[in-house]
């Protein structure tokens, strides 16, 4: 991604799963988010030693990293350690209710310990990791923490308590394919999102066989994309733009044979596939000219945004340019991006999903 000598990348590692988000009662919550704040403070205190300017920091993240960036935007540290943000495929959060912590306590036989938290901490981390993976425990952030998260994102934006900084936000066309390859039962798949039977039936009717084919894989993929990524991204982008925040939105819709995986066929522009283009780490073997061109264009836009607080010519702010204000990276018309309307990609969001989803 480093295409200019003035760009200094700083990549941080934070705790995840139970190590970062244990959700244990009466303990500090969202430790992983606290790690990120500490890392930003370190950058603020030390980036000058590397030739950087602490007043010109742009933060960006993808997937759970995009969600982390969203929460930093919603409840910013003081003093503000960044001046711009990029959210790639920021996922809507299913906030933890502590259920997985209780399961882990039982699985580790710590339920009768005087301190369940200390009992779990005393167990080797590799053992804990194996238990989590074997039992598919998902330790996610909690919105009950008033230090690093907000519960009502809409109120935060409209009340101007978020960071007042420009942002790039977007998602991929086929976000769901990587997560739904084994789906054969749509009812069962939707139950993980906690929708009741009546709502599940309505959702399934929105993704008919006539439009998506008979494969549960492709129908579930489209559902997952809209539930977790596409529609929350659309809602958040419009919310920020309507409240005076410079917002630039993209859709990544490019796929290349040398980035495909055999374990989820017809993956398309799958979750995280844009990272290869942004960092320039795509497989050079089999790379085609338009793949190389797209990588250069996306890297240039990202770097321009970090330097100038706008991506540059050809990518207008959301809410301008007569409605053609979303840049489509890929697709059929241009290998390096062209402008489309939100209505062309958000149809199901505005006609159906907005009643069930939120920006949080």
Task: Show the residue positions of the predicted features.
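Serine-hydrolase-like catalytic core of hydrolytic proteins
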Residues: 1-117, 156-179, 293, 307-313
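Substrate-access "cap/lid" subdomains that shape
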Residues: 79, 84-190, 220-225, 230-242
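Short glycine/proline-rich turn/loop motifs
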Residues: 18-24, 203-219, 278-285
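C-terminal, loop-rich substrate-recognition/catalytic regions characterized by aromatic stacking residues
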Residues: 162-206, 346-359
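Mobile gating loops/cap/lid regions near enzyme active sites that modulate substrate access
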Residues: 234, 238-360
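Alpha/beta-hydrolase fold catalytic core
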Residues: 196-242, 247-249, 254
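Active-site rim elements
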Residues: 27-30, 90-93, 106, 154, ...
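A structural signal for well-ordered alpha-helical segments within the folded catalytic domains
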Residues: 34-41, 67, 99, 137, ...
